[in-house]
């Protein structure tokens, strides 16, 4: 859940987001060490007038500063590729939901059900109840079962959009004429907020996404009430 003046990531609520947080910390530590080393060398160069003549043309030094960055890049690339393959893997999804982007709202269709689809519009600020989040509440939430793999099929009917839910590690482009897919799984119940993350016109910032993750029994009751 996001909170005011937040500087870090939202709490991870999916295995993918947990992996992304670990990868972020891993990469940040490497960048921090490299930056510290570079600043230290620069400070030494600026504060001393001595010159080490034997290192002005040394193949050993050139070999080190060629091989070492290559090793560092490999240490960054390997976990990154692992996460990319994890995000692309979809095995036997329990549910498929088709998401269509419009100017400026989202529509959802539960393809495993015969007639379960709806549009999701942002609730205007004037209609919010106490405790509601400004520019993030919608009239129809996407209710999904927790702890089950869900396939999201994402496209657009007009311009480029992007369907993103940060706490679940999701961000997939909605492209007219093309069907993209993403895997969604939540390890806990709750409300998860997102927004369109691709500039799509004057009301781009008024396209919120709200996922309500519930136990399977509650989802079955909700789906029966919607059909």
Swiss-Prot record:
Q: Which GO terms describe its molecular function?
A: copper ion binding; cytochrome-c oxidase activity
Record membrane topology: Multi-pass membrane protein
User: Source organism's superkingdom?
Assistant: Eukaryota
For this protein, the parts annotated as crossing the membrane are 15-45, 60-87
Keywords associated with the record:
Copper, Electron transport, Magnesium, Membrane, Metal-binding, Mitochondrion, Mitochondrion inner membrane, Respiratory chain, Translocase, Transmembrane, Transmembrane helix, Transport
Name any cofactors this protein relies on.
Answer: Cu cation
List the GO biological process terms. Answer: ATP synthesis coupled electron transport
Q: What is its EC number?
A: 7.1.1.9
Pfam families (alphabetical): COX2, COX2_TM
Free-text comment on the cofactor: Binds a dinuclear copper A center per subunit.
Ranges facing Mitochondrial matrix side: 46-59
> GO CC terms on record?
mitochondrial inner membrane; respiratory chain complex IV
- Gene3D superfamilies per record: 1.10.287.90, Cupredoxins - blue copper proteins (2.60.40.420)
Positions annotated to bind Cu cation A1: 161, 196, 200, 207
Q: Where does this polypeptide localize?
A: Mitochondrion inner membrane
Q: Where does Cu cation A2 bind?
A: 196, 198, 200, 204
Q: Which InterPro entries match?
A: CcO_II (IPR045187), CcO_II-like_C (IPR002429), CcO_II_C (IPR034210), Copper_CuA (IPR001505), Cupredoxin (IPR008972), Cyt_c_oxidase_su2 (IPR014222), Cyt_c_oxidase_su2_TM_dom (IPR011759), Cyt_c_oxidase_su2_TM_sf (IPR036257)
Top enzyme category: translocase
- Kindly state the subunit structure of this protein: Component of the cytochrome c oxidase (complex IV, CIV), a multisubunit enzyme composed of 14 subunits. The complex is composed of a catalytic core of 3 subunits MT-CO1, MT-CO2 and MT-CO3, encoded in the mitochondrial DNA, and 11 supernumerary subunits COX4I, COX5A, COX5B, COX6A, COX6B, COX6C, COX7A, COX7B, COX7C, COX8 and NDUFA4, which are encoded in the nuclear genome.
Q: What does this protein do?
A: Component of the cytochrome c oxidase, the last enzyme in the mitochondrial electron transport chain which drives oxidative phosphorylation. The respiratory chain contains 3 multisubunit complexes succinate dehydrogenase (complex II, CII), ubiquinol-cytochrome c oxidoreductase (cytochrome b-c1 complex, complex III, CIII) and cytochrome c oxidase (complex IV, CIV), that cooperate to transfer electrons derived from NADH and succinate to molecular oxygen, creating an electrochemical gradient over the inner membrane that drives transmembrane transport and the ATP synthase.
Family stated for the protein in its record = Belongs to the cytochrome c oxidase subunit 2 family.
The protein's name in its UniProt record? Cytochrome c oxidase subunit 2
| Organism of origin | Oryctolagus cuniculus
